[in-house]
């Protein structure tokens, strides 16, 4: 005997709403004027939580005398009701994840029992058993995975076998098509700037992204729940802005928020999307005071917010080997000042043009000798690496592909040229490298540019010739400016951020265990 789906009237309301709205838009002149001469939709007149006071009367009057207006008001009313069901309380489908008769998730409705994969009690984790950490990320850019791997490495270094750490791409691995195409969609959007800007800023208002998550949850809740539960986590860490809302709704629906520590590690230094913040998190780790202010504005309490810095791989905390030793190991000149040119993991950006400009600017024709040298990281772009390697340079140039010990490359150089990725900026500051930013992704990276400039850490320059000229001056008459920026970078660096995060997480999970054991004893 098969069990009917637990997702009943609520999803059907939402699914009924979508075609209604679509048909209405297609069959009505929403963008034109109605019989009263008023535009039915204006940029600031419709708020799903209520109409703006200034424009409410025009909007209501324009709709009240037509069949289309009546239909639209009814549809908006249905939409508001559905969104309240999804945003103000837990949908029925999340209280029981909708398993068929032959399936079992191992957890009874009262929260007791074990999950079938690991047979470890949910609400009575034994102190002797390894605690489990699940890190949620997505390969939309390299920074999220880098932060996830940094946290995993820090857990291993600090606690050894006390913790088992798992990293999963929640959307790619635990959602159905088309939701599992998120990384591919992101890569397409960021290559088409206007599309990405429209997507980023268009989903920033709370009413938009809350309704998006509510609608999306209907289709992915079952798969995401299975993906979360199979790891039996004591701690869930989100390092991605799209990993808070749906998982938290599922955990709340299962009554697991009191048993599992759910935290967010924001990986944007300044500008960040509002979806990073959710009031139900145990902790939100912010990389800067700017981000902490955004978290407070989003409604998080001071006790939920910690400003520790951006987590970077633990290898950056270790003592730096002498520059000449690192340069010798990398095949560089041991005495000439060096600039590091990076294009990210995919070797994107105007790397070739910038490298050629540096090759000319760092050569003194009068003396017939170089005034500096260049280290280029091409990432996975083998074609670019081959092309740069074939050039007959007038200065010492080392071309590398994808490197795993970027801390050694940074330690061998005196300044860096890169796009405004937060992870690279944080790592460069730890190594005391003045930064020249040559590009950024609209939205999340836009705030990193003023962050670098206003803190006296570097400059933003687009032109390869201007970049080369600045580096040449830093290695010559403006060496003092380079030194000041290096000191500022070290002053703003937070090399121990990842260790502070994992120790705070350890304390949080121990508090949970103590409370559960005390409750059982009582």
Curated annotation (Swiss-Prot):
Effect of residue 177 to A: 90% reduction of activity
Single GO cellular component term: chloroplast inner membrane
Mutagenesis or variant effect for residue 448 to A: 90% reduction of activity
Matching InterPro entries: Diacylglyc_glucosyltr_N, Glyco_trans_28_C, Glycosyltransf_28_UgtP
Cellular compartment(s): Plastid, Chloroplast inner membrane
Biological processes annotated in GO: glycolipid biosynthetic process
Pfam families cross-referenced by the UniProt entry: Glyco_tran_28_C (PF04101), MGDG_synth (PF06925)
Consequence of changing residue 173 to N: 90% reduction of activity
Entry similarity comment: Belongs to the glycosyltransferase 28 family.
Protein's UniProt name: Monogalactosyldiacylglycerol synthase, chloroplastic
Taxonomy of the source species: Eukaryota, Viridiplantae, Streptophyta, Embryophyta, Tracheophyta
